Amino acid sequence: MNSEINQRFLARGSQKDKGLAVFTSGGDSQGMNAAVRACVRMAIYLGCKVYFIREGYQGMVDGGDCIQEANWASVSSIIHRGGTIIGSARCQDFRERQGRLKAANNLIQRGITNLVVIGGDGSLTGANLFRQEWSSLLDELVKNKTITTEQQEKFNVLHIVGLVGSIDNDFCGTDMTIGTDTALHRIIEAIDAISSTAYSHQRTFIMEVMGRHCGYLALVGGLACEADFIFIPEMPPKVDWPDRLCSQLAQERSAGQRLNIVIVAEGAMDREGHPITAEDVKKVIDERLKHDARITVLGHVQRGGNPSAFDRILACRMGAEATLALMEATKDSVPVVISLDGNQAVRVPLMECVERTQAVAKAMAEKRWADAVKLRGRSFERNLETYKMLTRLKPPKENFDADGKGIEGYRLAVMHIGAPACGMNAAVRSFVRNAIYRGDVVYGINDGVEGLIAGNVRELGWSDVSGWVGQGGAYLGTKRTLPEGKFKEIAARLKEFKIQGLLIIGGFESYHAAGQIADQRDNYPQFCIPIVVIPSTISNNVPGTEFSLGCDTGLNEITEICDRIRQSAQGTKRRVFVIETMGGYCGYLATLAGLAGGADAAYIYEEKFSIKDLQQDVYHMASKMAEGVSRGLILRNEKASENYSTDFIYRLYSEEGKGLFTCRMNILGHMQQGGSPTPFDRNMGTKMAAKCVDWLAAQIKANIDANGVVNCKSPDTATLLGIVSRQYRFSPLVDLIAETNFDQRIPKKQWWLRLRPLLRILAKHDSAYEEEGMYITVEEECDTDAVA
């Protein structure tokens, strides 16, 4: 089924007769508060009566003060907090019919027939059972004279929508569950911190991470920190695993590596079903290798801390979509889970997802390991393949001849053009190792176009890129210089090094440069090689992709800074902060940071604003302050307007807010480029580069003659690899020209603009802002392949 994005008109107050409740159940995860906030505020916008059910199903059974009406202020200043403000508990009573009968009565007395369930597969299964029994529960309540027949008729259908909150990412049907990205942040922060002490003392660290039945955290954490060995439930090693582990670690030490990291998921076991614990691994290393091995059990640290920007935005989108799904539900509607498919919020039948999730557990219990990995989805499968390849010490012998030359080896080059961005080094490492694994030779071009012309080119070996994944910046060096006017010198260098395929990693400049080189193919035969671009810039302003490498790290930096800036006004007086973000003419950072930071407004170039809009926002801020809100946050993209500068907006708010609030201005600058790349950027760089190696090899193979001369003339041999909707896509550069605004260096169409109405709905106080209605995009269910 092809996906369709339907625009629907949602009028303010259009659902006045409906009652909706939101609750969190099971284990907590970071981002749940953002989901609760989005559900509540979207429901208030639509005119519903909204309730919190505190302490999960237990609160539903107990009733009384556990079910409280929520208002706009109930969910203020919670988006940045971990855990769940409404509490979560495991509930034995709800498992019994008598408990569910009490819960049904408590809901009916308050007119609640719409439930948003935020939890894991157990919580969602319980909610579905409750929905199926609803009619018989009501019959019993009427029979007991607990409710009237009028109430039974009025509330005869219960609608439920699920949101999956779980740090394990163990739910089939969604690419990411709420909390997983933040848990990965905690794991990577811990490993990055431990690496320095391990390096100092030549230690082996064994890190135990959560994941009793799912190895996602261990697997992706291992990819993001270059772990030497991982143990996960879906890929149990053979009983001789101690031999393989020791052989791998010993080889790495002899190759000069000072630190080793082994990650163990808490549910790890061998093929016979015997558990493998961190203690077992330490014992093996101590006895056989005599290494100084230490154990770190992360435990509940992974559940804690502030949610990442990704989890906040995911929860905002899912929470709003859950409310809309409930409002549109009919008595015949199948209950759905709001899932993430690639970069799209979709609705997926709840029980299909639950059954598939349970099928994974069944496959593992029956020792059908390959089936278990397959059921986890393509994303998990590819992560596993990538991990296995990248952690080999040496490329496989069968890909090389007796002289050590690659049997089907080509000569590839990689370079950066543009500003540095986090994730570039991870992409280079992956590109180098994937290519060498195949038998290719890889050249690293230092300092972009200028370095190429100067001959600053060297062959990169397998161990040259060790330890690159977790490092920010660009180790190869990068400059913004474009090739225009220097084609002759560039062609001469490509000829000198016999380059047969080129990868360019960088921002808008890399896309522009690749296009310029491809345009000169008729004049310079050396340019008739396959060329591919990986977009890498915090601005996220490159056409042909929805995310560029580095923008997640930039977004997290801004979100974290906004949290700190806002906290600086805690306990003092009413204050508004005006913050300027980077991004050139692209408003991605300002908009998404606004959504993740709970900003009141975000001014960007793509959405024109007038003095009237600014005035309206000042009045809105004043009315919020008058009703007890103590802090306001305004974001402005650096090139949002030539005349309405950050200073102008700051002065306007300062003048108009006299007597009500004070105003402060912050220009964030280069700290937004980030320190250490986020797990998202590390893994995106790793996967994208792996795909580029396969693509370059396929293009060279199809266009090479007997003498080894590559002749690529067709437009589809110069491409940009991007994430588009649900999958990775290689887009010919010539096709992207029509989609590009070269003057402002931005794409003409940008997916995130459809999130701006959501930003305004979640920021506007009911009494402060009256509008007839608002267009917001409702994204429908889709069953195509997810981004893998």
From Swiss-Prot:
<feature type="active site" description="Proton acceptor">
    <location>
        <position position="168"/>
    </location>
</feature>
<feature type="region of interest" description="C-terminal regulatory PFK domain 2">
    <location>
        <begin position="411"/>
        <end position="788"/>
    </location>
</feature>
<protein>
    <recommendedName>
        <fullName>ATP-dependent 6-phosphofructokinase</fullName>
        <ecNumber>2.7.1.11</ecNumber>
    </recommendedName>
</protein>
<feature type="binding site">
    <location>
        <begin position="120"/>
        <end position="123"/>
    </location>
    <ligand>
        <name>ATP</name>
    </ligand>
</feature>
<dbReference type="InterPro" id="IPR000023">
    <property type="entry name" value="Phosphofructokinase_dom"/>
</dbReference>
<feature type="binding site" description="in other chain">
    <location>
        <position position="638"/>
    </location>
    <ligand>
        <name>beta-D-fructose 2,6-bisphosphate</name>
    </ligand>
</feature>
<comment type="subunit">
    <text>Homotetramer.</text>
</comment>
<comment type="pathway">
    <text>Carbohydrate degradation; glycolysis; D-glyceraldehyde 3-phosphate and glycerone phosphate from D-glucose: step 3/4.</text>
</comment>
<keyword id="KW-0460">Magnesium</keyword>
<dbReference type="GO" id="GO:0009744">
    <property type="term" value="P:response to sucrose"/>
</dbReference>
<dbReference type="GO" id="GO:0061621">
    <property type="term" value="P:canonical glycolysis"/>
</dbReference>
<feature type="binding site" description="in other chain">
    <location>
        <begin position="300"/>
        <end position="303"/>
    </location>
    <ligand>
        <name>substrate</name>
    </ligand>
</feature>
<keyword id="KW-0324">Glycolysis</keyword>
<feature type="binding site">
    <location>
        <position position="121"/>
    </location>
    <ligand>
        <name>Mg(2+)</name>
    </ligand>
</feature>
<feature type="binding site">
    <location>
        <position position="575"/>
    </location>
    <ligand>
        <name>beta-D-fructose 2,6-bisphosphate</name>
    </ligand>
</feature>
<dbReference type="GO" id="GO:0005945">
    <property type="term" value="C:6-phosphofructokinase complex"/>
</dbReference>
<feature type="binding site" description="in other chain">
    <location>
        <position position="266"/>
    </location>
    <ligand>
        <name>substrate</name>
    </ligand>
</feature>
<dbReference type="InterPro" id="IPR009161">
    <property type="entry name" value="6-Pfructokinase_euk"/>
</dbReference>
<feature type="binding site" description="in other chain">
    <location>
        <begin position="582"/>
        <end position="584"/>
    </location>
    <ligand>
        <name>beta-D-fructose 2,6-bisphosphate</name>
    </ligand>
</feature>
<keyword id="KW-0963">Cytoplasm</keyword>
<feature type="binding site">
    <location>
        <position position="203"/>
    </location>
    <ligand>
        <name>substrate</name>
    </ligand>
</feature>
<comment type="similarity">
    <text>Belongs to the phosphofructokinase type A (PFKA) family. ATP-dependent PFK group I subfamily. Eukaryotic two domain clade 'E' sub-subfamily.</text>
</comment>
<feature type="region of interest" description="N-terminal catalytic PFK domain 1">
    <location>
        <begin position="1"/>
        <end position="392"/>
    </location>
</feature>
<dbReference type="InterPro" id="IPR035966">
    <property type="entry name" value="PKF_sf"/>
</dbReference>
<dbReference type="InterPro" id="IPR015912">
    <property type="entry name" value="Phosphofructokinase_CS"/>
</dbReference>
<dbReference type="GO" id="GO:0030388">
    <property type="term" value="P:fructose 1,6-bisphosphate metabolic process"/>
</dbReference>
<feature type="binding site">
    <location>
        <begin position="90"/>
        <end position="91"/>
    </location>
    <ligand>
        <name>ATP</name>
    </ligand>
</feature>
<keyword id="KW-0547">Nucleotide-binding</keyword>
<dbReference type="GO" id="GO:0005524">
    <property type="term" value="F:ATP binding"/>
</dbReference>
<feature type="binding site" description="in other chain">
    <location>
        <position position="745"/>
    </location>
    <ligand>
        <name>beta-D-fructose 2,6-bisphosphate</name>
    </ligand>
</feature>
<keyword id="KW-0479">Metal-binding</keyword>
<feature type="binding site">
    <location>
        <position position="664"/>
    </location>
    <ligand>
        <name>beta-D-fructose 2,6-bisphosphate</name>
    </ligand>
</feature>
<dbReference type="GO" id="GO:0046872">
    <property type="term" value="F:metal ion binding"/>
</dbReference>
<feature type="region of interest" description="Interdomain linker">
    <location>
        <begin position="393"/>
        <end position="410"/>
    </location>
</feature>
<dbReference type="InterPro" id="IPR022953">
    <property type="entry name" value="ATP_PFK"/>
</dbReference>
<dbReference type="Pfam" id="PF00365">
    <property type="entry name" value="PFK"/>
</dbReference>
<feature type="binding site" description="in other chain">
    <location>
        <begin position="670"/>
        <end position="673"/>
    </location>
    <ligand>
        <name>beta-D-fructose 2,6-bisphosphate</name>
    </ligand>
</feature>
<feature type="binding site" description="in other chain">
    <location>
        <begin position="537"/>
        <end position="541"/>
    </location>
    <ligand>
        <name>beta-D-fructose 2,6-bisphosphate</name>
    </ligand>
</feature>
<feature type="binding site" description="in other chain">
    <location>
        <position position="480"/>
    </location>
    <ligand>
        <name>beta-D-fructose 2,6-bisphosphate</name>
    </ligand>
</feature>
<dbReference type="GO" id="GO:0070095">
    <property type="term" value="F:fructose-6-phosphate binding"/>
</dbReference>
<keyword id="KW-0067">ATP-binding</keyword>
<keyword id="KW-0808">Transferase</keyword>
